[in-house]
């Protein structure tokens, strides 16, 4: 399958950082004052003449000056930053003032002014990140106390990609995440991604839960500039608190919040371009017709379909209208398309109010061509605007109000047909049947062949479609410190309301279409005959509207306190969510969930850690008595590096940590089926006519639809995880995890119930079981060589393999080679090839001539199984009789290869920073992924319509022929018609 647009991109990035603030200057008279440039917001308060003037230099542990260090007077809004040489000047109100020094990647430090006037400081890098705060389920923890399998990634890494969809930046960047981008089409280019692979049957929910600021939202709605932290929860101890939503893992995203200090403004702009990484290369008309002659001869035709004179016309391009040679892929696509991204971030605040505002724009064009002579535009272009504002207000010293509002507006224009149809037309249309259009007397005429399309017409003449999307997200939270009851106790309430709307309009038309011209008249004009009349105007608009809204409520109680060497943490919360879809005036029954969750964690002497989590959740998707479930987890951890006997080796082993967990999580996404415990009724038009005397009334018939199963419940996953973390020399961080998951009660339709049971639709059941296991690892290296040079490396590797332990299969399949139990989820099935037929595989008569079968093929030897898919000849694929019945048929299909989804995903890259110049390079890839070259609908093999089914790849010469009867070729014998089936049946091993 060819992707519509692939994301090979070159990126030109311009980052402008401006610290907009009041700056203190020393006048000639010795007086200090504030000077503000025009348009710059003053934020440093004017001080009285009695203020104390402080200056100094801030350096790192190696004595190199640090530029951009934030220095704020504790409890006030007065502050400044160091210049490029690490120097600063600041006026403080009194000698009791406390200066707070903060800098990313360094430990925060506080210094009392006292009698000092010159305060110099050496800041120290944060060691191994043990004190770093990591976002976890319904809260945050220090990295040292985390015993679950959690991967975090810096927001800067996510912003290095140049596509609209944030999900495209996960593969290879985040250990444990397997992601596949199926399309590059603007607006539809997001990746499918899974945490630690797939462990449920296709159709059931396999996507992870994505929470933005604690609210269930869509990852690709975000702009990377909005993100402050990004965490992936992989094991049960990390995700059990989410109960029936945690089986597939959880992604937690926190958006940027305001920081104490003067406002900073960051402006970012980038220009990039998109081009297809690889498009199929096809042969031209002359080669095509020559090959068709060869195939005809091989099939016993005495006369070639195309004369050499005709082929010479194509070679010499004597008359391109009558003898065209069209590269349809080049005709309908551009070489590249431009993209732009721009964002602006404003961040700052005081002890009372802190704010972060992020606005962004993203524009992207598609690679399909348009007809610029049209008054309307069928070209693909997307414009997206994001805005997010997060405000934190300290109402009192113990009460904080949070108000967060965000959203986006996206407008898109594209051709009226789908991109899949556009590519399909280019794949299927040979280069010689007609040109894109005829131009006669300044008029344009579009040719087409029956049962085919004109790819150029499809892309440029069929009209256009526009879509508009908008979303508003809101969150309100109130947190109260309850230290008057006991220190470390807090209560927090959260309310969120989101609303999404989508609307689309399609304006379509069809031009007049003509039969391909075959000759010219005596005046040299093309003789054109109409094939079908179209319309010269765009059709009436077709409107579609869709949307949804979601409400979320949460109340949580948090406790965190340290008693000597003992550190305890606790969480208890209640939440509920209401989600409703609506289409035009039709409202769908809301989806509702509610539950409670809790966490208890104990750490002794920063070395030994134990944690218990649980979720008790309910879903309206099940019958009463089956709606709620309890999902517990336990985890332990041991920090060897914190032992006293390790202190002499601290410079080398900055972190050595062992951890393990076990627990249960659930999944209530049941293959799109709602209220499966209820029996449904269906209706059709095959009912009865009622009445007398010629007056009859028709009544539709009703029938039993899906049979209700009252004891259906959620899928349950037991997860086991063992992890090891190693830090070396305060610059290398290595993490590896082994995981094993057993998923049971998988929701599926029964397949072995006979039709005599009377079910119109087979009933559902919690029947399936799947095991999933693997490893994921991550390596990060960060080294500040000196004040000007920084070097970094990052890499990740994920391997996940699943196996179906139990699955309800049809009686005729169970116990045979077609059984899917024991195979991978979404395992590919097909015939097993045993090479190509040779001349020795067929019977001859007494005269030495090959025996001809009734279907036109040759008669195979008696020791070779009968092939039922069509006539066979030397050069065709020989298939294995897997079930041993002497016949090759669909009953011989068995597991071949693997799955379309990769089992291995990896990535690695390096980055250098010298002064203000950054250089980044990153590679990502996947392995153990399989697919068929073409299958039964192969578009690259000659066929029967107009002498051909589709285009032919340029590597066609690597094929079996009588002159080259090799087994080591890319293609088997090329043919057409019914015989073509034998060379296209799904199979494994033959050049896959």
Give the ranges of each region predicted by the language model.
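Beta-strand-rich extracellular modules
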Residues: 102-106, 479, 782
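Acidic/polar loop-and-plug regions of large Gram-negative outer-membrane beta-barrel proteins
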Residues: 301-324, 398, 408, 413-473, ...
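Short solvent-exposed strand-capping/beta-turn motif centered on an Asx-Ser/Thr pair
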Residues: 61-63, 481, 727, 784
